[in-house]
């Protein structure tokens, strides 16, 4: 079952470490507290097999919890009999994996102990509304005196035929804040004691954002 799991962690930032060959490598640091099974879905009642995982438990008194969490979410956790978490993630698994799972089971970094590379998903940094030069790398117009065309997109249509602009062209719009997956990132180090995972290179999102880590779909056999 462990090979099918995706676990949630928190991006802490980036550091440099030396690899086994003495090369300086830029790494992303992901802290990963245990993910807890908060709900089990089976094909007979839900139409598919899945496990819902919860991370980042909300540890506050019951009276405070009633104020911070809305009733539908509280009812969901009460029905499953699990603790209350800030983040939930559903993972599709096989029927055998569902039969093995039990409410309250915890999964941590030990899931990736035998893994050399992982896929990481997260929400990229939001850049707000941006023009075509920043978002798509357009060259822009002349930088000289007299030019009224510096950072514009330029022509986006043709002539009287077709007499319209085709949809999907590159235009100024919101940049960032989208789901991004980076595949086959090398695992540099797993620290089970500190619950920290180091992967080579950058990962999506700002510091403190939630990322989802899974075994790489492109890993060599």
UniProtKB/Swiss-Prot annotation:
One of the primary rRNA binding proteins, it binds directly near the 3'-end of the 23S rRNA, where it nucleates assembly of the 50S subunit. The keyword Membrane does not apply. Keywords: Ribonucleoprotein, Ribosomal protein, RNA-binding, rRNA-binding. This is Large ribosomal subunit protein uL3. The gene is rplC. Part of the 50S ribosomal subunit. Forms a cluster with proteins L14 and L19. The keyword rRNA-binding applies. Disulfide bonds: none annotated. GO terms for biological process: translation. Belongs to the universal ribosomal protein uL3 family. PANTHER family: 50S RIBOSOMAL PROTEIN L3, LARGE RIBOSOMAL SUBUNIT PROTEIN UL3C.
């Amino acid at each position: 079952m462990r090979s099918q799991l995706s676990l949630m962690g928190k991006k802490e930032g980036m550091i440099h470490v030396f690899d086994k060959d003495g090369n300086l490598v830029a790494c992303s640091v992901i802290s990963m507290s245990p993910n807890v099974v908060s709900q089990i879905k089976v094909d007979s009642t839900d139409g598919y097999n899945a496990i819902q995982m919860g991370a980042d438990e909300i540890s506050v008194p019951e009276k405070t919890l009633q104020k911070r969490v809305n009733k539908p979410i509280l009812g969901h956790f009460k029905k499953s009999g699990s603790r209350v978490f800030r983040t939930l993630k559903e993972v599709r698994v096989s029927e055998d994996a569902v039969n093995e799972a039990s409410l309250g089971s915890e999964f941590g970094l030990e899931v990736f102990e035998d893994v050399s590379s992982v896929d990481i998903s997260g929400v990229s940094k939001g850049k707000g509304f941006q023009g075509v030069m920043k978002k798509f790398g357009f060259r822009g117009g002349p930088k000289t005196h007299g030019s009224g065309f510096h950072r514009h997109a330029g022509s986006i249509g043709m002539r009287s035929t077709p007499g319209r602009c085709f949809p999907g062209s590159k235009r100024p719009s919101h940049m960032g804040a989208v789901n991004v997956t980076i595949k086959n990132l090398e695992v540099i180090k797993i620290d089970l004691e500190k619950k920290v995972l180091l992967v080579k290179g950058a990962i999506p999102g700002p510091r403190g954002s939630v990322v989802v880590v899974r075994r790489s779909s492109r890993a060599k056999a």
